[in-house]
Amino acid sequence: MEKSCTIQDVFERFYPSYEKRNNPPSHHRKTAYHIMNCKTGAFGVNISVCEDCGCISVHNNSCRSRCCPMCQEFPKEKWIDAQKENVLDAPYYHVVFTVPEELNSIIYSNQKLLYDALYHVASATLNELSKDAKYLGADIGYICILHTWGSAMNYHPHIHTIVLGGGLDDENKWKETGGNFFLPYGVISKVFRGKYLDELKSLWNDSKLKFHGTAEKYQNSYRFKELLDKCYEKNWVTYCKETFNGAQSVINYLGKYTHRIAISNHRIKSMTDTTVTYVVKDYKNEGCWKEKIISGEEFIRRFMMHVPPKRFVRIRHYGLLSCRNKRKKITHCRNLLGCKKYISTLKNLNAVEMIKVLYHIDVCKCSSCGGNMVSPRKDKYSSSFHAHMRC
């Protein structure tokens, strides 16, 4: 049994056999190639030479895949830093929209179409209810982020929304209720359920849905109607996970959800020639962590379920926080609230400068003597370079 293994290790061992058995789509193959070759030199290298002692440093480039566990830190930090300019010192709420597991097979068969529908319906629900004077009577702003996994990497599509707890009324004045979240969860759940099932019905009537695997039975109109009726009868889980106040709290909180992948390296405990052991949350036992053992190919299959469609945008901004509105309207809200503007610290910085700001490491200094590290001149260091690369 091997200890301290990573997702890259698991893919290197089990993905080749998984690919032979399953013939995955091209974007899954690309993701696997990126994960297996990240920081191995396959994506190029950066060479630096010390001007004083001649020490050579070689840094293997990362793959930059959004599904790679080794490539999320920089995008996360840059994204969070960019949001500082749009965050207000006002209440924020974390609302989660989920769908019944009965819809999982249809959603997985139509990922791009029905993921987009999740965003659209969650947005329509929040907009409709927040504009109702009975609840708030204002235009609000929020960020939606799709996650498709549960703790065990099972398929569990749901939308995380970070909702600004106030907005602009018809007179362009700031309005908030204070205290608890301004929308009743039961009302949100019913409206979201109705809108999403109406969307499914419309797509089925327009013959836009595909049915694969266990979803094939829903090509039959009677079976599809039975499914919708069953989902109408269920209570859809919509809840507010946390309430927090203050810009810095929001900024710190955002990082937990924006650039997550299905599983991180630290949750993988070990692997054998045939199995992988990782830890999952046992929600039936107060959320305690427990170890789970599955076959290596099953681990790959579960991971691949959560690779997003090509060019799919997972983080979307709406209302006051949309690209069209945030420059003018957030500035107006800030003036009304008397908030100070948070200034980005990473804007326009390159990777070397970001490393220095975030980790206080100067990669331009030699680790041996403290001299300046520079890119080598081919005529002066070509022999040393080739000798190093052969090692």
Residue ranges and their predicted role:
Residues 1-391:
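Beta->alpha loop/short-helix hinge microenvironment recognizer with preference
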